[in-house]
């Protein structure tokens, strides 16, 4: 801290002292609240006095406290603002300001964004853009530095973030640590590149990502330095991570829903646990909610409300070293939410820095990041090796199963979006798609184009439609576009108001339903079918990857997919 900033901090703190002692009037008084204190598990009546954007004091009702402005809580519950400790804002399909407009009314006041989607497309400039866009969003947007760009040696996106750039990014204001270390095979096999990135992160927080890792391998992974994991899907996996000293991030998003399965562990009141959404789409944010919906599920599942609130407030704040967030207590930032009850968690109002929260209205430009499938796309056919197994797609999960060759019902094509002209195809089962094509430009993590479709003509038409839009989501049938959602920010995000973006996405989903698709969230599920660090089979432009064996399957004798 510089001398000037220390002097400024001292001035703020000294005013808080004067206001707390009643020597000066505060800026805001929230009178007649029931304060939720997750640090002690209590709920108690108090008036909350705010000055300089921070809590000055919690005082007993009726003590004649002075403030420039008073908000009557009338017995409403006052909880700390909710903090999502691990989220990819891009998965909402919204820019940070539009994302804020969707989640501030749900009580979310801060997020730790992991922008490896934008960084895979744009490089380090994508991280800088996310932090800058976050400043004007109305939310407190912190960042973590992507550790795996590309996610594995089998992916090739728009950028490579080496250890030197990771170290540079870790010094950026607003960055809290190293993001999910997804390349766990590289960690376990002592690969130089993975360990150079770990070297850059030592001394700070290192997020983990260890899907399916167990036993001695999990012990080894934890010994390498990661501090957390959000990939547990069973109580046994969750307890094993806690016993290994890892913080447990319980994930509940649009593609992976693990909260119900892990509730038995949360009822055991583990000290080092939190709730995260990871990836959640705009339509789900508006219809179901954000962290508020996870709190509803926790309380319905038997947790005490204060214990549930701790999972989205003081616990994630402690994990990330945000010492002035996560509690309604003297000296803490006055980020809090007024709730009608502690069962439905209906939000009455949200405050950030002691004022009613408002989302920003402007997004900085993000040039580049379009879609270029290359000249060969115009005549491409999408052949599948006869020996390749079928990728079994699972609703509400980002893992896939393995089916016998020849048992699939819809073809998946993944094509390089950066002009290299590479593509591959495999058969899938479980999507229900019987014709036409659903295409996206947001295939994790390199964000290539993924097309789930029938005829070669529809697959090609869907890809060309994405090129024309600069990226997005599109449904094609009979060579014609039936519905689309352009995502002009890096081919990942829209700056439409959340309600409008959600309506367009719902139209896309409805159009996919007409083609037979049965996936509850087809765009989100499709977006994970290329993530090369999640078992069991994933498709890249270079071929079908057996994640467990950590190798691309050989391209042998081919059989042509649907003609046309």
From Swiss-Prot:
Enumerate the SUPFAM superfamilies for this protein.
Composite domain of metallo-dependent hydrolases (SSF51338), Metallo-dependent hydrolases (SSF51556)
The question of whether Manganese is a record keyword is answered with yes
State the Gene Ontology terms under molecular function. adenine deaminase activity
Required cofactor(s): Mn(2+)
A Pfam family (short name) is Amidohydro_1
Q: Give the enzyme class.
A: hydrolase
Q: Does the keyword Hydrolase apply?
A: yes
Catalytic activity reads: adenine + H2O + H(+) = hypoxanthine + NH4(+)
Any single biological process term in GO: adenine catabolic process
Keywords of this protein's UniProt record, alphabetized?
Answer: Hydrolase, Manganese
User: Which EC numbers does the record give?
Assistant: 3.5.4.2
Q: Which family does it belong to?
A: Belongs to the metallo-dependent hydrolases superfamily. Adenine deaminase family.
Task: Name the HAMAP family on file.
Answer: Adenine_deamin (MF_01518)
Protein name from the UniProt record: Adenine deaminase
**Which species is this record about?**
Deinococcus geothermalis (strain DSM 11300 / CIP 105573 / AG-3a)
Taxonomic lineage of this organism? Bacteria, Thermotogati, Deinococcota, Deinococci, Deinococcales
Report the gene name: ade
